[in-house]
Amino acid sequence: MLELKNINVSFRSERQDKIFGHTRQQVLFDVSLTVKDGTCLGILGESGSGKSTMGRVLCGLLKPDSGEAVLDGVSVYASRAGRRNLQNKLSIVFQDYTTSANPRFRIQDIIGEGLTVQERREGKKLDRKAETSRLLELVGLPADFADRFPHELSGGQLQRVCIARAVACKPKIILFDEAISSLD
């Protein structure tokens, strides 16, 4: 189970008042939610409403000003063990997939990043070629894409590769930040 409890996040405003100091813009105010195992949840909102910020809090990339994120009873921000618990159970597909895929890696290496996580967690070696082929086919791409580079794929195809990488480590939770916006 994943929980957010009374999450507050603010950022320094671009507009600064020289007399009274810096102002802060509240992005998330007292947000609480519980996502039970096996649940698929979509968060909808206008541009700039805090959806991506909430995603960054959920995946441990942004510590909130106050409040708590809890995964399976372990506070994400309270300890290194909490962050490790999160890293072992969560995978993310970013909105800007072009910067999340190393342009010098072949597709098999990009997906291999997720397979490395799975191998470490399970303590066993995988047949990487077979797993990469399976994952590419799972997201609707041919297995021979494994030898290509990101610049050789369309935006939608590269987005699918990023989804395959997220699935590769067999996470308990996959967080998508507008991850299907570029699929063809």
Regions found by a protein language model. Name each.
Residues 44-46:
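The feature captures the beta-strand-to-loop junction immediately N-terminal to the Walker
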Residues 126-144:
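Conserved ABC ATPase "signature" region
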Residues 170:
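Conserved catalytic motifs of ABC-family nucleotide-binding domains
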Residues 149-153, 157:
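Conserved ABC ATPase signature
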